[in-house]
């Protein structure tokens, strides 16, 4: 009987060790839809093309998801870019944040380190999975067979009209994911998770994330550390701060209306 207990203990220990050792690194590339409108007495189609191209390059980013069965870290890969020469008197430089998204599936929580308007925040909250609708469709992404899942909701945004007025827009949104049961973890890039396999592709109509490389059980053990720097807030508190700051910026823009000599470039990210 004692021998049986010892064997059972060893088997349990080995099983736990195997489960904990499963880990990997997935690389994703992003593309974002940009709706560009130019409000000017002398609309310049060539300038519009140049802005569109600069924005396209700015939004092409690379991210890594480092994961094990219980935790993950998702962050943008830093890369050195040669300075872009100003064209037609302008150059676009979009500030790319150093966001780090930590998810703990076992404890059902996440921590998101993010920066807005020069201030660092640490968003801590409970994971809130969407009610995904599993669809009987498949496709291959690299060497993996992926299955489709969709989620429908509404998104509300504030924007400035061509007249400089603040407009609130609510529109339907469909998010489509592709996940593979061949990598049996319920995780994915950014805030996405909750499907029976690693999520390899995301498309919400504006943003597309596609996995381009996966390393399972790399030789060097992966490091997953929860971020700790920043002002700690909940997700709701952060969104309230973000909305307030965005509204303040739009109001400042409104106050300068009429002093832009009739030339204004309006860039809307998304549809």
Predicted regions and their residues:
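Bacterial Sec-dependent N-terminal signal peptides
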Residues: 1-28, 271
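Extended soluble regions of mature proteins
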Residues: 21-271
